[in-house]
UniProtKB/Swiss-Prot annotation:
Residues 946-990, 1174-1202 form a coiled coil. Residues 810-831 are annotated as: Fusion peptide 1. The record marks R676, L677, R809, S810 as: Cleavage. The lineage of its organism: Viruses, Riboviria, Orthornavirae, Pisuviricota, Pisoniviricetes. This is Spike glycoprotein. Belongs to the betacoronaviruses spike protein family. Residues 1-11 form the signal peptide. It is found in: Virion membrane; Host endoplasmic reticulum-Golgi intermediate compartment membrane; Host cell membrane. Homotrimer; each monomer consists of a S1 and a S2 subunit. The resulting peplomers protrude from the virus surface as spikes. Residues 1234-1274 are cytoplasmic. Gene3D superfamilies: 1.20.5.300, 3.30.70.1840, Single helix bin, Spike glycoprotein, N-terminal domain.
Amino acid sequence: MLLILVLGVSLAAASRPECFNPRFTLTPLNHTLNYTSIKAKVSNVLLPDPYIAYSGQTLRQNLFMADMSNTILYPVTPPANGANGGFIYNTSIIPVSAGLFVNTWMYRQPASSRAYCQEPFGVAFGDTFENDRIAILIMAPDNLGSWSAVAPRNQTNIYLLVCSNATLCINPGFNRWGPAGSFIAPDALVDHSNSCFVNNTFSVNISTSRISLAFLFKDGDLLIYHSGWLPTSNFEHGFSRGSHPMTYFMSLPVGGNLPRAQFFQSIVRSNAIDKGDGMCTNFDVNLHVAHLINRDLLVSYFNNGSVANAADCADSAAEELYCVTGSFDPPTGVYPLSRYRAQVAGFVRVTQRGSYCTPPYSVLQDPPQPVVWRRYMLYDCVFDFTVVVDSLPTHQLQCYGVSPRRLASMCYGSVTLDVMRINETHLNNLFNRVPDTFSLYNYALPDNFYGCLHAFYLNSTAPYAVANRFPIKPGGRQSNSAFIDTVINAAHYSPFSYVYGLAVITLKPAAGSKLVCPVANDTVVITDRCVQYNLYGYTGTGVLSKNTSLVIPDGKVFTASSTGTIIGVSINSTTYSIMPCVTVPVSVGYHPNFERALLFNGLSCSQRSRAVTEPVSVLWSASATAQDAFDTPSGCVVNVELRNTTIVNTCAMPIGNSLCFINGSIATANADSLPRLQLVNYDPLYDNSTATPMTPVYWVKVPTNFTLSATEEYIQTTAPKITIDCARYLCGDSSRCLNVLLHYGTFCNDINKALSRVSTILDSALLSLVKELSINTRDEVTTFSFDGDYNFTGLMGCLGPNCGATTYRSAFSDLLYDKVRITDPGFMQSYQKCIDSQWGGSIRDLLCTQTYNGIAVLPPIVSPAMQALYTSLLVGAVASSGYTFGITSAGVIPFATQLQFRLNGIGVTTQVLVENQKLIASSFNNALVNIQKGFTETSIALSKMQDVINQHAAQLHTLVVQLGNSFGAISSSINEIFSRLEGLAANAEVDRLINGRMMVLNTYVTQLLIQASEAKAQNALAAQKISECVKAQSLRNDFCGNGTHVLSIPQLAPNGVLFIHYAYTPTEYAFVQTSAGLCHNGTGYAPRQGMFVLPNNTNMWHFTTMQFYNPVNISASNTQVLTSCSVNYTSVNYTVLEPSVPGDYDFQKEFDKFYKNLSTIFNNTFNPNDFNFSTVDVTAQIKSLHDVVNQLNQSFIDLKKLNVYEKTIKWPWYVWLAMIAGIVGLVLAVIMLMCMTNCCSCFKGMCDCRRCCGSYDSYDDVYPAVRVNKKRTV
C-alpha cells in the first residue's frame, strides 16, 4: 500500500485535480509534439514471443515491433521561469492502439556530481482518467522521486499500480531536483471504492541513464518489455548498429485495452535558484515514443530468451531473402523473392471540367416566400454541393433515389435548385406527401422526384405568406401577379423558430459530356506510376501515361476498346492512356560481403513504378526509382556495376540469358557501406579451344536452305458394312443340309455378332473422328444500350425484319387524295425526294431539275398548286411588263424553262419505251426458234434411248434365266450327294462341305474384323493429325508432310480424310563435325535443343539447332551443365524368335477321299455371247441442246429500267368545303325527318319506337294517373 499512501489516495470524486502542492507556483505551457524517423535494427525494437524465446530456434513469426519511421518526440522537461516560478506542460494524451515503445533517459548526473538532478519516468494508461480504469508504471528513486538523503542514487524503484475506478491528476510529474522533499499533491490519485487491485514496488540497480521500454495490450493483459541499460551517447547510432534487444518482463491484468496514454514530466519549482533547482534548469529531455505494429519477421533466439538476430520480411530484398531461405547466413547465389508488391504509389482525382457555378448565397440566407419561390438551373459546370448541404444548419435532410453521402460525390446531367421558406406544418406534410395549401397552390413536387429536400434553420423574423387559391402543377408557380401581391401583403409574422429555409435539389442522371460535377480536391496527374484514380466519377487502379495516338470523340472524355474497357481519358486537353498495373517476380543476388542486387524479371526499368503496389519500405521505394538500373534480356537489374565487356566461364550467381552477377573485387564488410556486385556476360565455354569432345566426333549435314513443298496424304477412316445370310451361304436351298447345320449350334449367331462388332467398331471410330473435326459455334448476341443523347441509327442502318419493305398510303388516304401513276425512266423518284425533303415545296420545282444522259428533265405532271404558281408568275410578268419597261418579262423564263424540261422528260420516256419494244420483239422471236430446235433434238435422243433400253430388257431376261440355272446347280449337287449316299455317309459328306464353307466364312469375318481395327487405328491417326497438324504446328519432322511442318488443310474424301501438308524441306546442307558433349576444365556440357558443331577451318565449338544451321556462341541458355565428363554406356541385347513350321500332310489323300463317289458333271448352259451390250450415243443431241440453251440465255431482254412514278394531288379547298357542307346538310335533313315523323326519335322517350302510322294524340302526365283503355283517370 506504499504507493497509495504516498500519492495520498482520496475517496472524493471530482474532475481531474492538480498534481503538485499548492505552494508550487507553476505557469501552464502548451505541449508540442514533434515527429522524426529513426533507423533502428529490427532486433532492438521487436517484442519477442515469451513462450518461444527460450527455445533457441530460428523461425518465422508475426510479432509486434516499434514503427520508428514515425517516432514521436515527447517533451517532459518544461523550461524554468527564473525567480518568478516554473512552467508546467499541459501534457498531451496520445492514442495507444496495440501498444507503445518508449526510450527514455533516467538520470544525467555521474556518481561524482553533487547536482542531484533527476528525470524519473512515469506513464499512465487509461481513457478519460476520471472514474476510469487506470494502469500506472513509475521508475523513480526513493519515495516517488523525493530523496530521503542528499547523495547520488545508484538504485531506482519500480512502482506498478492498476485500479478499476480511479481519477488521476491532470498533469502528473516529478520535481527535477531530488532533495526537494514532498511536492506531490495529496489527491494526485483518487481511488474510488478501493478499486486498486495491483500495487507492487521493487528496486533495480542503475547502470546508465537510458533504457527502452515497451507496453503491449494483449488478451486483457498489459505485457511489459525492457532492454538493458543503453549508452547515453550517440543514441541513434547505437540503435542502428548496436545490439540492445528487449526481453519480456511481466504481465499486468488490466481487463482490456486502455486506449490512451499520458507521460509524467519533470518540473522546476518557482524561485529555483534559491531552492537548489537551479542546477537542473538547463536539461532538455524528450521521450522517443513509437507505436507498435505487427510484422512478418524471421527471428533467431538465444537460449536465455533474448533476440540474437531478426529480419523484417517486407523491409528490403536482403531482409526478405533471410525470410525466404529461413537463415541469416544463406549461401551465395540468386534467390527468387515474392512478387513486386506493397501499396499503390498515389491517388489521382480529376472531377472538374466546366466553369464554376456560384451558389446563391444571399438567397439561401434569406429565402423568398413560397408563393414566389426562386429557381436556379445548373448546367455544364462545377458546383459546391456543400454550400446547400453541409454548410447550412440542417433541420432535416431527406433524399429520393440517391444517398445523402453520395450526393456531393457524383456528376449529374443538370441540377435544379429551388429555394423558399416553409413552416413546420407544411414541411411535415411535404415530407410525408400530404396535400395541403403549400403543395396545392405554392410549390408541388413531381411524383418521380429524384433529388433531396434540405430544410435548414433560419435566423429571420420575416413574415410567412402562402397562396390558397388557383391550383398549380408540379414545378409550376402562381402566374397572376395581382393575386401574388395580395398574398404577400397579407403575410403574417411567425416565430422564426417555426419557419425554416427549404432547398429542393432536383437531379437529372448524367448523360452526355456536359455534366454538373461536385467540387473536389483535384490532384496532379501522376504518370507512369501505379495509382488509384477517380476520373470524372470513374474509379479504378492502373497506370496513366500520355498518349497522342489515342483518339477521343469530340465532346467526350473517355474512349473504350472493342471489349468495352476504358483505355483512354482526356484531362485538360491532354490524352492519357489507362493501362493495368503489372506484377512481376523479383530475384535477389546475394553475397555476404556485397550489397544485394535486384532483378525485376521480364520488366523494363521504365515500368518498375507500374507494379500493382508501390513498396512500403524506404529501400523498396529506392529500388523502384533508382537511377542506376540497367535493362537486360532477363529484366531490369538494380544496384549493380555494369561490365558488359567482361565474359566469365564460371558463375555462382546466373540470372539467365548468359548474364551473371560476380564479386569483381575483394570486398570487406564494414559499418558504413558494401561494394556492389558486377553484372557481366556468362559463357561456360568461353575460349573453348581447349574443350575436348566427350563422345566420338561425327560428320553430319545440317540444312542451310529450304523450299516450300506440298504433300497429299489420304487416310481411310471407314469401310462398307457387310451383312451375310449364314444359313443360305452354307446350305443354299437344301433342307437336308439345314438339318445337319442345326448340329453346329450358334455358329451363325456368332457370325452375326462378329459382323455387328465390326459395325460398332466402324461407328465408334467414325464418331470420334467427327468430334475432332467438328467446330463448336455459338451465336454472339451483342446488346446495344443507347443512353443519353447518343444516336447510332445512322451507323447501324435498318434494324428489324421489315427492312426494305415498301410503305403505302392507307385506304383512307387513297379515298381523300387523287393519284396519278406514270412510267418513270429513272429520274422521277429522285425529283420527288428533292421536293419532299427540302423547304419550299412546289417553289423548288426548277431547283430539283434532274439530268438524264446529259439532258435536263422534269416530270410531265404538274400539281394544281404548281400550275397556279407558274400561271400567276406568267400573268404577272406579262401584265407588269408595260410599266416596267419590259424588265418583269423575265418572269416568263421560269415558265418556259420548266415547260421545256417537261417536254424533255416526255421525249426521254417515249424513246426508252420504243427501244424496249424492239428488244422484246427481237429476243422473243429468237427464243421461239431455239425452243423449237431444242424440242426436236430432245425427241431424237429419246427415241434412241428407247431402242437401247428395250434391248437391255431382253438381255436382262436371259441373264435371270441363266442365274436361276446356276443357283439350281448348287441344290442339284447336294441333292445328288444324298441320292448316292445313304444315312450317315451322306450326312458326313455334307458335314465336310459345311466345315469347308465355315472355314471360308470364318476367314472372311476375321478379315472384316481386322479391316475394322485398321479403320479404327486410321481414325486415331487422322484425329492425331488434325490435332497436331491442323490445329497446331507440329514439331515432329516428316509427321505432317515431308520436312518441317508449316500448315495443313484437311478435306473430306470418300471413306476417309485427305490432308494437304505444307512444309519446308532442305535443299542445301552444311557438312560439319558434331559431338554429343564437351568437356572443359573438368566440367561436362551438353547441348540443349540443338547440337555442338565445329565449323570447318575453326577450332572453336559453337551451338546450332538441328533444323537450321546458324552457329552461335555456346552460352548458359543453350547448354546443360553435367556433373562430370564421363559417359555411361549401356548395351541392350535383343533376340529374334523364328516361327515354327507346321507338320506336313497328304493333301491328295484328303482330296481323293472327299471326291470318292461324287459326280462332277454339270451341264453348263450359260453362254455370255447371247448378250448384246449395246450403248447409247446421244452426244450430238446433247451438244445441240447445250447450244440451244446458250442461245436462249442470249435472248435475255435487258430492258431499260422503268419505274412507276406516283404523284399524290390534294383536292382544292373549295372541293373540301363543298364536301363538308354536303355532309352537314345530309345530317340536318335526317334529323329534321326524324323529328317530323316522330319515328324512332331521340327526343321522344329516348328512342321509344312506335308505328309511324299510329295515333299521335297523347298527353303529358302532369299528375300521377292510371291509364285504362287509352283514357286517363286521375
